[in-house]
Regions:
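Conserved N-terminal diphosphate/IPP-binding helix and adjacent helical/loop segment
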Residues: 1-89, 95, 99-114, 150, ...
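Amphipathic alpha-helix face/heptad-repeat signature
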Residues: 18, 22-25, 29, 82-85, ...
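Residue-level signal for inorganic ion chemistry
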Residues: 63, 132, 158
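Inter-helical turn/loop segments and adjacent helix faces that build the functional surface
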Residues: 70-75, 135-147, 162-179, 191-209, ...
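Active-site alpha-helical segments that house and flank conserved acidic catalytic motifs
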Residues: 79-103, 153-154, 185, 189, ...
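Divalent-cation-assisted or electrostatically stabilized phosphate/pyrophosphate-binding catalytic cores
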Residues: 106-128, 170-184, 207, 211, ...
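Mid-bilayer segments of alpha-helical transmembrane spans in multi-pass integral membrane proteins
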Residues: 119, 151, 155-159
Length: 244
């Protein structure tokens, strides 16, 4: 357990360094997300505003901004738009995930489904995904559109696979890794690869960053699941054992 906590601390330290390096752009990502989530339906506005107030590290958005920076992307604000897009995919999966798991608490606060019910939460999650795809089409890069579309499909398949094996105490390591690779690591991998695509880097750099993102995502989820297995609600911010 101590090793996992140390690993989480190392990730948090690296996160702080990354955030500091792109902090100005992250502010613009937040503004872009708020703008894109604006709706003519008052309940949608109410629910998305609540979700934004619950916070979040914006880690996947930071990975897109960070990789775009190290790949020397400097033309316009496409990195900001696509970082917002990646974050919207993540937010939508959380909303759907909370409904599936019947979660009442996330980040120490009530989930959308515990306040507004399952139907509204699912539809608002779908709304986020539709806004995300709208942004991808506006960006106009088919490679990015294909990457994030296939990633969204992979996340859904990972969630279904997890449901299929939920509660299995004797789950094979291979099955567990397949689940977290799809539902978590795939979006980390996409977030890091997008930055290199924006900068028109050669395939070996794209593949290297994608590989890095995937392994970071696996590490993150393994640490998160270990804490889920052996932690306390007041420290973890959500119901313990929900992912098992």
């Amino acid at each position: 357990m101590g090793t996992v906590v140390q690993l989480k601390n190392r990730i948090n330290n690296s996160y702080s360094e990354l955030k500091n390096s792109v902090e100005e752009k992250l502010v613009l990502v937040e503004e872009k997300i708020k703008l894109k989530l604006s709706s003519k339906v008052s309940l949608v506005d109410e629910m998305t505003s609540y979700h934004l107030r619950t916070g979040g590290k914006r880690l996947r958005a930071l990975l897109t901004l960070g990789t775009a920076k190290i790949c020397e992307y400097s033309k316009g604000g496409r990195d900001i738009n696509l970082a917002a897009c990646v974050e919207l995919i993540h937010a939508a999966t959380l909303m759907h995930d909370d409904v599936i798991d019947k979660s009442k608490i996330r980040r120490g606060k009530k989930t959308l489904n515990s306040i507004w019910g399952n139907q509204s939460s699912i539809l608002v999650g779908d709304y986020l995904l539709s806004r995300c795809f709208e942004m991808m089409v506006e960006d106009g890069n088919l490679e990015i559109l294909k990457l994030l579309s296939s990633t969204s499909a992979e996340i859904s398949q990972g969630e279904v696979l997890q449901l299929q094996h939920k509660g299995e105490i004797d789950m094979l390591e291979e099955t567990y890794l397949k689940i977290i690779s799809a539902k978590t690591a795939s979006l980390f991998a996409a977030a890091t690869k997008v930055g290199s695509i924006l900068a028109n880097k050669e395939n070996k750099i794209k593949e290297a960053l994608e590989f890095y993102g995937k392994n970071l995502g696996l590490t993150f989820q393994i640490a998160d699941d270990t804490l889920d297995y052996n932690s306390e609600l007041k420290f973890f911010g959500k119901k313990i054992g929900n992912d098992f």
